[in-house]
Amino acid sequence: MERGEAGLVPVDEGWFVVNAREMEWLAVDGSGAWTSFEGPHIRFEQVGVALNVLGRGDAMAMYHAEETQEDFLVLSGEALLIIEGRERPLKAWDFVHCPSWTEHVIIGASDGPCIVLAVGARRKGVGCATR
């Protein structure tokens, strides 16, 4: 691990243990903050993992669908899931499974932070479709 401007980043493909608070975090107005546990030159080839911290109204992404499976676990707070055109409230410990091409977005709905763990399968050359 190496210290970057915004926290720790992995520098090689070996194993590591790190506290999420020490990782490099990115933030965009309206999208909250997140860390992917990856670095600029290190990318997990098989599975993407991200920890997202959402404020009220922050969207994790655009309303979209992925070619591969995505799963989400709300660790704290509350969120609104929009999935296949339907709304569903989420709370701590709710798990969301999105098979391939399931349109979805998660939006923070708490007065305090909503923390969501996201895990997605990866295949080379695979992207997502946004609407």
Each PLM stretch: what is its role?
Residues M1-Q46, A129-R131:
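A short, N-terminal "cap"/entry segment at the start of jelly-roll beta-barrel domains
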